[in-house]
Amino acid sequence: MTRRILSGILLILSCLSSLPAAETNFMSSAGMSTNSFNVRDFGAKGDGQTKDTAAIQKALDACVTNGGGTVIVPAGCYLIGSVVMGSNTTLQLAHAANLLGSPDLVDYPLVRGRWEGEFAEIHRALISAEKAGHISILGGGSIFGPSLNLSRLRNPRGPVLIELTECTNVMLEGFSTQYQQLWSIHPLFCQNFTARNLIIRTINTNGDGIDVDSCRDVLIDHCSIDTGDDAISLKSGRGLEAMRLGRPTENVVIRDCTLISSLFGGLGIGTEMSGGIRNVRIENCFISGHQNGIFIKSRDGRGGFIENIIGENLIINNSPTFLALDLVKKGIQASDPVTGQVEQWARVKNISFNHIQVYNVMELVAGKNVPADRPIDGFTLTGITGNCEKGITLANIVNVKLAGINVTGLEGPLLTTNKVQGTGLNNPSAPAK
């Protein structure tokens, strides 16, 4: 409640200070066109009370019609419903520009989209794009999500803040977001997606920061994400529907970020992963999760794969668990689950974490929930320091490598295993060879 009140006060102060006199002209950094389109020239008021949806949409449309360029949002508070960006467009938010989501659900039209891993009818995002290329949202402004009735946000799903579908060459940089109720940023089926120097804040369950969904070539760089759910979640759909599409999330780099979750995890991989997740590197990040720092997860009936996950130079602080592996998790099931004694389980291999510092962590690794019918193949943990109460628990994993694990404060054994094969199992503290 305190966070919500403070957020409201900050928003009011921000709107009071963002008067037209403080307007700043920006040039496009997209390098595609020097055209510029000021939303005030299209009738936007920026007074925080008048709905500026139509005016801003006209500016965005004019940008596309004229071959691309920059849509300038000067200082002010712009109350808007859903708007759609097109190709070759930069949306430039002035430092004191605030986009405020309309509290009226009717301002977010119903469309088809993916929600919790399956296609369904959803409300269109506050800012969306589909099958667009070379789009950017830049600048030091802020985007505030709408305040809506939570009971009406699931069927159909309510609007997320930014949702980009089948887009290429996307840049999100420099702005901040705040939303109480749903995901903030959801790239779906995108290629060459970059999020840099963003400040993302959410509060409630389902308040994920960035949900990377069946995307490839992704960079999340120098972002500060503090959420009520997963700070970053990597997904690729669930069930046979996603397996048939065969569109994994792959080639993802997360670096130099602060990831904080007040309810779940700093980084979640799965459980919606039937299309596969591979080639993920997270490095030089500070992570604090209410349940887990990093959570690799799946369920029966998901199939798919998770492979080539690397974490290096991470600080995990105030988390019950540094790393949790739960591939038999219970919960929401796909409407068309993958069947077969072995095939129903995710294929997981090549998980590696090196040079990790843990502080005030209750359990180092919780890795016993792995199906015996499909063991993890390849798990490396080296160079772990800090303090924790409970050590490492592993089950049904082959090709394990443990070395240089030196933590203090243990109240039991450093390592407990069941059906585990590899090196360093007898002395995990020994230096790596």
Predicted feature descriptions by range:
Residues 1-4:
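Positively charged n-region of N-terminal signal peptides that target proteins for export
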Residues 7-18:
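Bacterial N-terminal signal peptides
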Residues 19-433:
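Extracellular/periplasmic carbohydrate-active domains that bind, remodel
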